Regions:
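Glycine-enriched, solvent-exposed interface loops adjoining structured elements
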Residues: 2-133, 137-139, 145-195
């Protein structure tokens, strides 16, 4: 994993404790307990919200706050006759960050969405980008890379992605904790007001 300065590696229970503390749901006095009589399981609701928050963070937060790995050795690459490379993305990759094929003169950091107007020129042999101005289209489970010169093998120099930790933990930069929604306990969907 890259960019590990000030990175936290938290279990789900450790992250749950952070959320409870930020929301004021953790007693501050040792020996005190909080009990509910309405049957609401606050921990389950917080865990669900916590998982949603982390999934959203992986999809949209700046990559310097998230676990980023080079997955180039885990890609399945296929090249078409027209030089377009299809890369099958490994399941832990949430989103691509920076990719580069060996012959390219620069890397790609903007990944177009299928159907975007900018993709129209990519499939035309006369307007398709080459090694000086490469392009990529992100289909989620596969990425099309435009394009490779004739006779070149599809060899990746890098395929950096934001990755989801396989063990269900939370890996993130400590400053990302500031994005936890802590307005008040009632603002979390489905949580009753705590008195």
């Amino acid at each position: 994993m890259e960019n590990t300065n000030q990175f936290l590696h938290l279990s789900e229970s450790e992250m749950l404790n952070i959320w409870k503390n930020l929301l004021g749901l953790e007693p501050h006095l040792c020996g005190c307990t909080i009990e509910r009589e309405d049957g609401a399981n606050v921990d389950e609701r917080l865990i669900t919200r916590m998982r949603q928050w982390y999934a959203s963070l992986l999809l949209s937060a700046p990559e310097n706050l998230l676990p980023v790995e080079d997955v180039k050795d885990e890609l399945a690459l296929m090249v078409a006759d027209n030089g377009v490379v299809t890369a099958i993305v490994p399941p832990q990759c949430v989103r691509p960050v920076e990719w580069k094929l060996a012959p390219w003169k620069k890397s790609v950091t903007l990944f177009l969405q299928p159907g975007a107007p900018e993709t129209a020129y990519l499939h035309n042999e006369w307007t398709r980008p080459g090694i000086h101005h490469p392009a990529a289209v992100d289909f989620g489970n596969r990425i099309l890379l435009f394009s490779l010169p004739d006779g070149e093998l599809p060899i990746m120099d890098m395929a950096r992605c934001v990755v989801r930790p396989a063990d269900g933990t939370y890996k993130l930069h400590s400053s990302a904790l500031k994005t936890i929604p802590v307005w008040n306990a009632t603002h979390l969907t489905g949580l009753p007001e705590i008195e």
